[in-house]
């Protein structure tokens, strides 16, 4: 791809920028290094790690397309070189609140550890919904989440977790529609490493009414910098 100045990537990102306000690039660590498996092999045992394009690609994209509204998925185990690439790129990484409560150890996903330059999610397409997670996660994890976030049935567990996202220092918060609607695991988008039944959920017009819109609007205003003037 470098030989043609990353033509495919340039066209792809350019097209996405026309369709969406923000583009998210998943599997960011692959731009630092990736595991290459021979196409003819049936298993991954003969694969080898290879260097990714690194900043060379992102420098070319910026030169051709200018500054782009990009979020990068930097979840999971990150090597020092991946962290350096993220810093050098200037793109915001992701924080998923659900990931914060897997253990009692201090986690980078706990809101008090967020840097400002990041994007916080209650969950992604690969997570259960908040309400589903509250029912299926280990009891100690749920208890930790309730204590840390002061989650209550009265407020709604989903609204409590959204409150945590909005009130964090993260530059941006993104909430899946299923969490906004308070839906359970039946509305989950995807279960990784499974086939069938994924990517089928759709919101309907009947689920989104003025009452919900007004509540969301108030919450968004509450956590803006000029909230006092708006409320």
Model-derived segments and spans:
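Alpha-amylase-like alpha-glycosidases and glucanotransferases acting on alpha-linked glucans and related
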Residues: 1-174, 178-185, 191-206
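A short acidic/small-residue loop/turn micro-motif
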Residues: 209-210
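C-terminal accessory segments of extracellular proteins
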Residues: 216-222
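Conserved small/polar residues in nucleotide/adenosyl-binding loops
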Residues: 223-231
């Amino acid at each position: 791809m470098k030989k043609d100045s990353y033509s495919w990537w340039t066209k792809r990102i350019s097209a996405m920028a026309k369709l969406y306000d923000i583009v998210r690039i998943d599997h960011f660590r692959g731009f630092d290094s990736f595991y290459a498996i021979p196409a003819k092999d049936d298993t991954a045992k003969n694969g080898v790690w290879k260097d990714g394009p690194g900043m060379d690609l992102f420098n070319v994209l910026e030169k051709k397309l200018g500054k782009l509204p990009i979020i990068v998925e930097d979840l999971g185990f990150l090597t020092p070189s991946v962290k350096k690439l993220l810093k050098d790129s200037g793109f915001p990484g992701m924080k998923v609140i659900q990931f914060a409560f897997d253990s009692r150890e201090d986690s980078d996903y706990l809101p008090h550890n967020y840097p400002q330059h990041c994007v916080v999610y209650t969950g992604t397409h690969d997570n259960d919904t908040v309400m589903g997670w509250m029912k299926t996660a280990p009891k100690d994890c749920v208890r930790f989440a309730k204590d840390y976030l002061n989650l209550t049935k009265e407020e709604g567990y989903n609204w409590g977790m959204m409150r945590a996202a909005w009130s964090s220092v993260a530059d941006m918060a993104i909430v899946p529609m299923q969490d906004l609607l308070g839906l359970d695991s039946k509305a989950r988008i995807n279960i990784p490493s499974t086939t069938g039944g994924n990517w089928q959920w759709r919101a309907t017009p009947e689920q989104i009414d003025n009452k919900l819109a007004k509540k969301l609007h108030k919450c968004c205003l509450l956590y803006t910098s000029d909230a006092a003037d708006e409320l």
